[in-house]
Amino acid sequence: MPLTHIRLLLNGKKATNVDIRQSVIALREQGHTIDVRVSWESADMLRFITEAIADNVGRVVIGGGDGSLNEAVNALMQQPQQDHKLEIAVLPLGTANDFATACGISNIIQSTLELAIHGDSYPIDIIRANNNYFINAAVAGFGAQVTAETPTELKDFLGGGAYTLVGLAKALGFKPYQGSITTDKGTFNGDIVVGAICNNKQAGGGQMLAPNALIDDGLMDITLLKSFSTFDIPVVLDEIQAMSHEAKFCYHFQTRWLEIDFPIKLPLNLDGEPYPTKKMRFEVLPKAIQFVLPPNCPCLVQSTQKSGI
């Protein structure tokens, strides 16, 4: 078996993790070439990706959370088109790890590094948002405001699900955002409480926002929650659970592109990173990057074909 050369790009906050060090040493002793680079600030990722391409490293492993993965994807997309063949794997070390979790990637360090070395890579979609990119999900409105403005304890509390989210939206006196949303299916004008634009199935620390989403189908999965009154809460909760295409308050649909236009800045995050904006165009870039995934990953089109869905 030829020696495998990968490069681990490790979030600096995790540099003292003893388990990572021991796993890297063990894999090196097996004959694998594993370089390690440790980031100090977000700007380091662009340099690390550029250097990996220049050094002919075939595969990089992103050791961090969804934010680190987002940095890597944006850094790769800034490279010339022919260099997008650099393969990306992830060692999930963040708080949420939504993308990795949805893909069935383990948080056990040794086994995940072994997957990064031996696993197959697959072409997957990413989504362009104006001049930025994201791999997992964009959340707008109340959900993004919570992410940006509330402490960790409240974010953890929100992980309780739709009942908590809806209850807090009213308890906090949240005011919906009025604007327009346009897709290839038409334009919606009205008040939005929450909007989620998903490439993968979950976001927000384990909330299954788009259970039918696939990362290589050329589509983004959209969830929109319209303004509602206290009396409407039972209906809203039912619609959130039903994930129906036809509803009064909570809409779910798929599209290849989407544009938003709001008169005031809308709280928005891309893979958890804040990008408040008035206008933005979202567009799927089909099979734009190569990503290392476990066998039978539930987020690929082939998984639905095997299961007969």
Swiss-Prot record:
PROSITE patterns: DAGK. Its main location: cytoplasm. This is Probable lipid kinase YegS-like. Its EC number is 2.7.1.-. ATP binds at S39, G65, D66, G67, S68, L69, N70, E71, T95. SUPFAM superfamilies: NAD kinase/diacylglycerol kinase-like. Belongs to the diacylglycerol/lipid kinase family. YegS lipid kinase subfamily. Transmembrane segments: none annotated. GO terms for molecular function: ATP binding; lipid kinase activity; magnesium ion binding. The active site is at E273. Residues 1-133 form the DAGKc domain. Its cofactor is Mg(2+); Ca(2+). The keyword Metal-binding applies. It is found in: Cytoplasm. Binds 1 Mg(2+) ion per subunit. Ca(2+) may be able to substitute. InterPro entries: ATP-NAD_kinase_N (IPR017438), Diacylglycerol/lipid_kinase (IPR005218), Diacylglycerol_kinase_cat_dom (IPR001206), Lip_kinase_YegS (IPR022433), Lipid_Phosphate_FormReg (IPR050187), NAD/diacylglycerol_kinase_sf (IPR016064), YegS/DAGK_C (IPR045540). Mg(2+) binds at L214, D217, L219. Keywords: ATP-binding, Cytoplasm, Kinase, Lipid biosynthesis, Lipid metabolism, Magnesium, Metal-binding, Nucleotide-binding, Phospholipid biosynthesis, Phospholipid metabolism, Transferase. One of its GO terms (biological process) is phospholipid biosynthetic process. HAMAP family: YegS (MF_01377). GO terms for cellular component: cytoplasm; plasma membrane. Probably phosphorylates lipids; the in vivo substrate is unknown.
